[in-house]
C-alpha cells in the first residue's frame, strides 16, 4: 500500500511539473516601441518638437475675420540643438555660420506670403519672422546667425481673411501644411 501511495505521489509530481512547464505565460500588458530618425550632414540637429509641429488656432469669429481682423499670433519656434558652428565655420570653404529657411506650401493666388487653407473657409495663414512676412514659394529668407549649442528661430503665425479675389470667410474647419528647409552657410 505504501508503495502504491509513493508511486501515485511521484506520478502526480511528474504530471504537475509537465503541465506547469507547458502552460504559456500570459503577459499582463504589452506594447511596441518603434525608433526612427535621420542622420544629416549639418552643423545642427532639429529638435523633435520642431520637426513636426501642429498649431491649433481654436475657434475664430467669422465676422471678425471678414472685417479684416487677424487671430491672436501663435508662436512657431524652430529649435536647432547640438550645434557645432565653430567646427562648421572651420571646415572647407568660407562659411559664415548662418542658416536660411525656405518655406513651401500652397499659396493664395498672387500672394506668396499667404498660405492657402483647405476647407473652403476663405482664410489664409501668414507667418512672420523678424518683422517680415515669410513667403511659401521656396525662396530663402534672411540669414540667421548661429552659435554653438542651442538656437531658436522664432516666428509667429496668424489666420486672416484670404486676399484671393472674391474671397469671403465662411464657417467650417480649415487646415494648412507648410514645409521648411534649412540651408547652412
From Swiss-Prot:
Recorded hits in Pfam families, A to Z, give: Fimbrial
Q: What is this protein called?
A: Pap fimbrial major pilin protein
Q: Which cysteines are joined by disulfide bonds?
A: 44-83
What main location does UniProt list? secreted
Q: Which organism is it from?
A: Escherichia coli
UniProt keyword annotations, A-Z: Disulfide bond, Fimbrium, Secreted, Signal
Q: What does this protein do?
A: Polymerizes to form the thick (6.8 nm in diameter) rod of the pilus (also called fimbria). The rod is a right-handed helical cylinder with 3.28 PapA subunits per turn. Pili are polar filaments radiating from the surface of the bacterium to a length of 0.5-1.5 micrometers and numbering 100-300 per cell, and enable bacteria to colonize the epithelium of specific host organs.
Misc remark: Strains of E.coli that cause infection of the human urinary tract produce pap-pili which are hair-like appendages consisting of about 1000 helically arranged subunits of the protein PapA. These pili mediate binding to digalactoside-containing glycolipids present on the epithelial cells which line the urinary tract.
The record's subcellular location field reads: Secreted; Fimbrium
What are the leading ranks of the lineage? Bacteria, Pseudomonadati, Pseudomonadota, Gammaproteobacteria, Enterobacterales
Name the protein family.
Belongs to the fimbrial protein family.
For this record, an example GO cellular component is: pilus
Amino acid at each position: 500500500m505504501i508503495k502504491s501511495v509513493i508511486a501515485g505521489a511521484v506520478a502526480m509530481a511528474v504530471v504537475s511539473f509537465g503541465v506547469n512547464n507547458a502552460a504559456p505565460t500570459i503577459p499582463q500588458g504589452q506594447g511596441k516601441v518603434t525608433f526612427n530618425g535621420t542622420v544629416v550632414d549639418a552643423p545642427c540637429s532639429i529638435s523633435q518638437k520642431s520637426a513636426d509641429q501642429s498649431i491649433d488656432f481654436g475657434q475664430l469669429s467669422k465676422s471678425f475675420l471678414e472685417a479684416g481682423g487677424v487671430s491672436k499670433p501663435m508662436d512657431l519656434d524652430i529649435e536647432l540643438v547640438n550645434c557645432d558652428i565653430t567646427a562648421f565655420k572651420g571646415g572647407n570653404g568660407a562659411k559664415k555660420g548662418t542658416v536660411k529657411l525656405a518655406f513651401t506650401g500652397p499659396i493664395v493666388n498672387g500672394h506668396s506670403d499667404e498660405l492657402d487653407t483647405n476647407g473652403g473657409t476663405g482664410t489664409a495663414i501668414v507667418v512672420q519672422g523678424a518683422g517680415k512676412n515669410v513667403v511659401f514659394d521656396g525662396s530663402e529668407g534672411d540669414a540667421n546667425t548661429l552659435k554653438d549649442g542651442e538656437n531658436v528661430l522664432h516666428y509667429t503665425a496668424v489666420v486672416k481673411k484670404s486676399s484671393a479675389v472674391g474671397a469671403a470667410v465662411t464657417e467650417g474647419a480649415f487646415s494648412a501644411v507648410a514645409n521648411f528647409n534649412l540651408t547652412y552657410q
